[in-house]
Amino acid sequence: MRRIILSIMMGLIATIAIAQERTVENRPYTDLRPCHFGVMVGTHLQDLEFINAGPVTYTDENGAEVNSNVTIDQDRWDPGFTVGVLGEFRLSTHFQFRIAPAMYFGTRHLTFHNIMQDANEDGNVKQEDKKQELKTAYISSAFDIIFSAPRFNNHRPYIMAGINPMMNLSGNKSDYIQLKKTDIFLELGLGCDFYLPFFKLRPELKFMYGLMNIYDKDHVKNVKDKSMLPYTLAAKEAHSKMIALTFYFE
């Protein structure tokens, strides 16, 4: 047992020693530039967090008042992709300010659960589900502050925080629901700079949460098919969430 423990300790010490060895630095002065530019590509997962309205009353095409109870859910994180450009400005040794205009493309898959009382069997409740694909195309411009650790060899970890205003370019009046055109995301993330011979590669993982209620309540005015009203009125709030993995080439 002692030999095993000693072997493990020696292996850890050797690994740490190797990791601490200095190597030739690629692009040693790249972080001293007052500003630089680059491109970005990535993927993301997006979700909608709904606050459902509960039972509602609406007027159908015959002028009669009808009660309904429909809930909305995006029951999975839907993938998308991101492309954009960036400009980064050096504030100090450890702080940078980044502006990153980009476009986020994706499709959300929504499920509507219509809970109805069966007229043929007293007291029984049945559920009817409907689906909707909600395509999204966001144009955005993120404003981020980056705090970087000291560079060691050819890598430099960092954390970041910022805000990301977005504008939704998609929307279809025939959909059950629509999202508002604008949203503002809070961003928190971490990443690492890898200094390659000809450019700097920066993989970054960030978590994004929409600060605004993007559920478009005015969409009900555009609904001509009254049978859609139970689904259009089903929610009162919606907040967007994303997890983004982005690769910056600088």
Sequence positions of predicted segments:
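Bacterial Sec-dependent N-terminal signal peptides
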Residues: M1-V24, F247-E250
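Short glycine/proline- and aromatic-enriched beta-strand/turn motifs that initiate or cap beta-hairpins
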Residues: Q20-G80, M242, Y248-E250
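Gram-negative (and chloroplast) outer-membrane scaffold detector with strong preference
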Residues: R22, N26-H36, T43-D47, L86-G171, ...
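Residues that define the transmembrane beta-barrel architecture of outer-membrane proteins
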Residues: R33-F37, W77-F81, K135-S141, H155, ...
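Flexible, solvent-exposed loop segments that connect beta-strands
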Residues: I51-Q74, T107-T136, L169-L179, Y215-A235
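Short conserved catalytic/interaction loops centered on acidic-Pro-aromatic/His motifs
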Residues: H155-R156, S170-I177, F199-R202
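Conserved C-terminal beta-signal and adjacent last beta-strands/turns
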Residues: T182, E187-Y195, K200
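Predominantly the C-terminal beta-signal and adjacent terminal strand-loop region
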Residues: P197-E250
